[in-house]
């Protein structure tokens, strides 16, 4: 992922080893800094052997910096992106999520199909309501991945969340030799 983002921006981007954990869904807003914090969310649905939703959540500073690098212009308001900005954000999220999806696919020996990404800028609580509405009766845990990017002498924390359907979470953890209670 860092290699692809570096190539896109023509600049070295370092990605530290991510922190990955399974957490209760209701803990996610707090881990993101609060339900009211504004994030840019890129959402991808996965299907086939593993079903659920991946979300790549970027803070406003990281979004503005990436767009500036990708588009070569100053971004005034990341909350109201134009079509070119949306496309660039979607591609960034697609690269990040698909790097984790490909790793899961290989590690679990599963085929995983990915939807076209969609993008929205809103408060974290609102962004998280999308998958919760869909999966409310299916499960209440998610894979929470914290990523730290370093470029331009700055450090940015972004998150990838995987909200699997309950059966997919059980199958994934069973395949990894972990128990699910």
Across the structure, where does each feature detected by a protein language model lie?
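Composition-driven recognition of glycine/serine/threonine/acidic- and proline-rich low-complexity segments
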Residues: 1-181
């Amino acid at each position: 992922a860092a290699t692809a983002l570096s190539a896109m921006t023509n600049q070295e981007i370092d990605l530290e080893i991510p922190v990955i954990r399974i957490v209760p869904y209701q803990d996610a807003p707090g881990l993101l800094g609060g339900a009211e914090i504004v994030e840019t969310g890129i959402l991808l649905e996965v299907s086939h052997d593993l079903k659920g939703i991946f979300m790549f959540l970027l803070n406003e500073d990281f979004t503005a910096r990436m767009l500036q690098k990708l588009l070569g212009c100053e971004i005034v308001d990341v909350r109201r992106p134009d079509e070119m900005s949306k496309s660039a954000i979607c591609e960034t999220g697609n690269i990040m999520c698909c790097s984790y999806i490909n790793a899961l696919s290989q590690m679990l020996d599963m085929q995983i199909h990915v939807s076209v990404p969609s993008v929205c800028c809103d408060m974290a609580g609102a962004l998280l309501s999308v998958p919760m509405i869909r999966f409310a009766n299916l499960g209440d845990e998610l894979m929470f991945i914290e990523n730290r990017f370093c470029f331009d002498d700055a450090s940015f924390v972004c998150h990838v969340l995987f909200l699997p359907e309950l059966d997919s979470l059980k199958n994934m953890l069973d395949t990894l030799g972990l128990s699910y209670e």
